[in-house]
Amino acid sequence: MPVFTHLDDDRARMVDVSAKGEVYRKAVATGTITLRPDTLSAIRDGTVVKGNVLATARVAATLAIKDTPRLIPMCHAIPVHGIDITFDYTKTGITATVTVISAGKTGVEMEALVGVSTALLTIWDMVKSAEKDEKGQYPVTGISDIRVLEKVKQDL
């Protein structure tokens, strides 16, 4: 049976990491948003009414990464030393990849996942008017495959 460090007698608690040493931490997470072809073209061409979609998604992801401990209750507040956010167009959407770097007592996987999720949600928000069908539904739009691609932990 797996051991869950954030549960104590079925009560949620924040794990004490004070005795751990600081080490280099890196996490890379990715996820994809599926969009209509016309929407992808509008993003590429810079004609989305709300503005520069990917620049806005990059800023939103950066802010979310810094706010991760406020969003994920048992996540420790750790120093974030570096963030890299990239976007790649696919045939049917956009893939966001977020890298977070720290030197701390705990990993940065949650920060990377929150960053990817927020980037993709921001893209959706900025293009939702173009993605809706005549009934106000989103038959094409979807967010998928959010996952951690890489986790690094090395002594300093």
Swiss-Prot record:
GO terms (molecular function) for this protein are: cyclic pyranopterin monophosphate synthase activity
- CDD domains registered for this protein in UniProt: MoaC_A
Give any single GO term for biological process.
Answer: Mo-molybdopterin cofactor biosynthetic process
Please report any disulfide bonds recorded for this protein chain, giving both cysteine positions. Answer: none
**Can you tell which superkingdom this protein's organism belongs to?**
Archaea
**Catalytic reactions on record:** (8S)-3',8-cyclo-7,8-dihydroguanosine 5'-triphosphate = cyclic pyranopterin phosphate + diphosphate
Which residues are catalytic?
Answer: D125
Q: Which UniProt keywords apply?
A: Lyase, Molybdenum cofactor biosynthesis
Q: What is its EC number?
A: 4.6.1.17
Pathway info: Cofactor biosynthesis; molybdopterin biosynthesis
Q: Where are the transmembrane segments?
A: none
Pfam families per UniProt: MoaC
| Chain positions recorded as substrate binding sites | M74, C75, H76, M110, E111
**What does the subunit comment say?**
Homohexamer; trimer of dimers.
| UniProt similarity note | Belongs to the MoaC family.
State the function annotated in the UniProt record.
Catalyzes the conversion of (8S)-3',8-cyclo-7,8-dihydroguanosine 5'-triphosphate to cyclic pyranopterin monophosphate (cPMP).
What protein does this entry describe?
Answer: Probable cyclic pyranopterin monophosphate synthase
Source organism of this protein record: Methanospirillum hungatei JF-1 (strain ATCC 27890 / DSM 864 / NBRC 100397 / JF-1)
Gene that encodes the chain: moaC
